[in-house]
Amino acid sequence: MSAEVFISYASEDRSRILDLVERLRKADVSVWIDQMGIEGATMWTQEIVEAIDNCKVLILAISPSSTESENVVKELALASERRKKILPVCLESSGIPKSMEYQLAGIQRVDYFLNQEDQAVQAMIRSLGKLGVAVNDEASDQAAKAPGFISHGSSHLKDAGAKKTK
């Protein structure tokens, strides 16, 4: 099944991503994630490549787990190579690692960690609509009225090389 939006995420973030998928689908956004789009006995790498090829936008769910995920880094690289539009969605307040910095330079992100997920989802819907993804009219109208949760790309890159302190 072809979808307009591919979500790249780490398996450790699955519960938050499934909540996000449900919210996006309520706005009639066509979403593909690995757990729902891969049939049994198929080559999962081939399915992922086809899903990225067929999507309009890759949502990159950024978290400490995803920045360490080899598969997430590969999906981002493939989407970038295929010139797909990328919408970074930060699940936590963390810097962008060097492995993703090049592909995300200058791209605005949505912050999904502010305990105001409804408004963040509205910002995503607004962004997806601007990137050519079909959303239902009611969701589009609500998104247009919602406050923004978009951060400018260059501001989040300055912490890319920063080390975490405990």
Regions found by a protein language model. Give the residues of each.
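A short, gly/pro- and small-residue-rich
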Residues: 71-85
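Conserved N-terminal substructure of TIR/SEFIR domains
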Residues: 1-61, 65, 80-84, 94-95, ...
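Short acidic-hydrophobic, aromatic-tinged amphipathic segments that line or gate anion-handling sites
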Residues: 109-115
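Short amphipathic alpha-helical segments
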Residues: 18-21, 71-74, 100-102
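Glycine-rich, Arg-bearing micro-motifs that act as flexible, cationic patches
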Residues: 68
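Conserved beta-strand/loop subsegment of P-loop NTPase cores
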Residues: 86-90
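Glycine-rich, charge-decorated loop segments at or immediately adjacent to ligand/cofactor-binding or catalytic sites
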Residues: 94-106
